[in-house]
Amino acid sequence: MAMMAVDDEYTSKTKEAGQRVKDHLLNGGLSNVSYHYQGSVMTDTHIKGHSDIDLLVICNKFYTYDAQNVQQILANNINFSNFQLSKLRTIVGRESYQGNSLEDLRTIRLESENILFWKYDICDLTHPKAIKITNQNLHRDVDIVAASWYDDVDSILNDQKIPYRGIQVYDKVANNISTPDYPFLSIDRINERSANTGGRLKRMIRFLKNVKVDSKNSIGISSFDINAICYNIAPYNYNNLHYLALVEVVYNQLYKIVYDESYANRIVSVDGKEYIFKGNNKRVEIKKLYQDVFTIYSILKTQNLL
């Protein structure tokens, strides 16, 4: 069924494609970087033919942090312990990076391009934020993304441990960095909640992804949005349900998003950093997805499977 995980062999080849890119960059002499993966493969919510793997190449020379909020907290000293405040003061007191951070990121991007261009017949260098290669032996795509570390208050208070750290992606055309993303926090949260619910969260995510790609309509929502839609369903609503019954749970969630704007506006991303539906037209797209799920739900009801 559309909720099932992709088979281990398929997933293994996807990860191997990412590892081969990493090995090429390591052997090519790229320095002062660390490598991390992001995306649906890391949560086992990927679907066949529609999911690649992202290899993050993160500069280790510098990081940035949320100076505005840190300074505000230190000025007001409200709701934080002395121990927490000392961590924030330590960050502020560190010597600032004296190099050119954008030039460092540009070097990572261009050196990565030079290494990979000679390793892959299909190597697309035109995208501002990613190098896109195809491993023709494994039949897998890999996106290679240059980025830097970003620490908000939560990350600093958690000792800049990777699950809490954000990243800022480098754009070679604009020669700047994006607003922070928190892929590792999202990965950890999805994996943890799904483990605590017997894999049901991931089944719902896969189900919606498959409905989207199989739809006759073009549905303009991302995996990021689908993750949030499912993650925001309270676990007590599905924790002990049979897997087929998850269709009704997802149907009810989409119904509320489509017909209750106030409810939709409260849905936040898995990392808790942004609202998914507030101030945009995504609910129009969700209605298309809802209609497809309603069709499946109705069939299951007619067949007395729900």
Q: What is the role of each PLM region?
A:
Residues 1-36, 40-50, 61-95, 305-306:
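N-terminal regions immediately upstream of nucleotidyltransferase
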Residues 4-9, 95-100, 192, 277-284:
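Short coil/turn segments at secondary-structure junctions
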Residues 13-19, 88-260, 301-304:
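Catalytic cores of NTP-dependent nucleotidyl/adenyl transfer enzymes across multiple folds
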Residues 20, 259-306:
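Terminal (often C-terminal) interaction modules
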Residues 33-34, 129-131, 226, 265-268:
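Residue-level recognition of the N-termini of beta-strands and the immediately preceding loop/turn
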Residues 42-60, 134-145:
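Histidine-centered divalent-metal-coordination microenvironment in nucleic-acid enzymes
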Residues 55, 68-70, 159:
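Residue-level signature of transmembrane alpha-helix interfaces in integral membrane proteins
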